[in-house]
Design a protein with these regions (language model features):
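Conserved SAM/SAH-binding loop-helix junction
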Residues: 1
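Class I SAM-binding transferase module
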Residues: 4-160
């Protein structure tokens, strides 16, 4: 848990913001088991909907999915920038301070999302339950890059 790591690294006060109630309860139990209840306060709710008792020096964020803006991080970071961070334009106020998504055209003939395999008789092409995002690893030897990667998006947390 990031809050426990921050407290063990020397943070004097940590606000662990968690929107999921059962996860927040488990976080509180983990904090208590670690003996850090005097340093870490688990705040239940979306960071965009809660008010912290004070502005913070550092945001240690896990708001990034497979690509930079997948989990709505841009809105979340902008809100934290305006309401939660003492010095939001400083790079050392954010971990991470920047997130980039890189992409490249590729050929991966073995991936069924790019072309259904002949043996997949049960697949219903119109069914949303069988729609999968295409996530390819450049380390896969069956993947052939068609061009060098290029930056697709960049989210800089220090910019208003």
């Amino acid at each position: 848990m990031l809050a426990i790591a921050a407290a063990r690294a020397g943070a004097g006060k940590v606000y662990a913001v968690e929107h999921d109630g059962p996860v927040a309860a488990k976080a509180r139990a983990a904090v208590a088991a670690a003996g850090l209840s005097d340093i870490i306060e688990v705040v239940e709710g979306m960071s965009t909907a809660i008010t912290l008792p004070e502005k913070v020096d550092l945001v240690l964020a896990e708001v990034i999915g497979t690509y930079a803006t997948e989990e709505g991080c841009y809105h979340t970071i902008r809100d934290a920038h305006a309401r939660h961070v003492k010095e939001p334009t400083r790079r050392d106020s954010w971990i991470p301070h920047t997130c980039e998504t890189w992409a490249a055209p590729a050929c991966f003939a073995l991936h069924y999302a790019l072309g259904l395999p002949a043996y997949d008789w049960g697949y219903d092409a119109g069914s949303k339950e069988h729609a999968y995002p295409v996530r390819l690893s450049p380390s896969n030897p069956a993947l052939r890059m068609l061009a060098p990667p290029a930056r697709l998006e960049e989210v800089c947390f220090t910019e208003p």
